[in-house]
Amino acid sequence: MPVLHASGLARTFPTERGTVEAVRGIDLTAERGEILGFLGPNGAGKTTTLRMLTTLLTPTGGTATVAGCDLVRDPAGVRRASGYVAQSGGVDPHVSVREELVTQARLYRLGKAEALARAEELAAGLGLDGLLDRKTATLSGGQRRRLDIAMGLTHRPEVLFLDEPTTGLDPGSRADLWELIRRIRAEHGTTVFLTTHYLDEADALADRLVIIDKGVVVAEGTPEALKRAHAGSPGASLQDAFLALTGSGPAPQGPSPLAV
């Protein structure tokens, strides 16, 4: 049984000019231990879908489960089974790495001694063990992203949602984070749901891709299968396939007027 399953997932928003259909019936699955890339141009519905799957937004149609827990009937169960790393992160710049990790563990009701042990375990596993007593404000961009991911893994989730995890990182830090994501999957069997605007990243990391546009799924499959089916020539890139499917290039970096 897929660890993540959505059927007809939809979300509308009322506006002064009428109802906006941000997501119009998305079907998708992710298997245990799979890295699933979720792609689409700005306004395609990626953000809305991710917010629904992480219980931050209630669907107006369809159903979805995470680790067998229904988004609407059991949102607490979904949150117990999920880790979520937002694009902007969320660390307190005035505390140490250790304090941030312990606080996160305590939020998941770990005892003080267990929380301290879990903080050290996460730091060792994610290359932060030499930084435990550093203030988070002094960390590099790559180190902060590792801390964000460590916080998302505190409660050993079955599914880890990563929203644009390498945005703003230099090439070396991006490569390091790619390797970390692969290792998390390999060592723990964690399912990773990855949104990204970097098509080289999706090509390198994802076992399978779901591409959406205008609130619906327009294609899914392995990166190689999508390139063969939609890029139009041998040796074509994932970007060629993406352009053919959506009629637009990767969304520009930086804020958009309305992210749905």
Please state what every model-predicted region is.
Residues 135-139:
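Conserved ABC ATPase signature
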Residues 160-163:
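Catalytic Walker B motif of ABC-type/P-loop ATPase nucleotide-binding domains
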Residues 102, 106, 113-131:
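Conserved ABC ATPase "signature" region
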Residues 156:
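Conserved catalytic motifs of ABC-family nucleotide-binding domains
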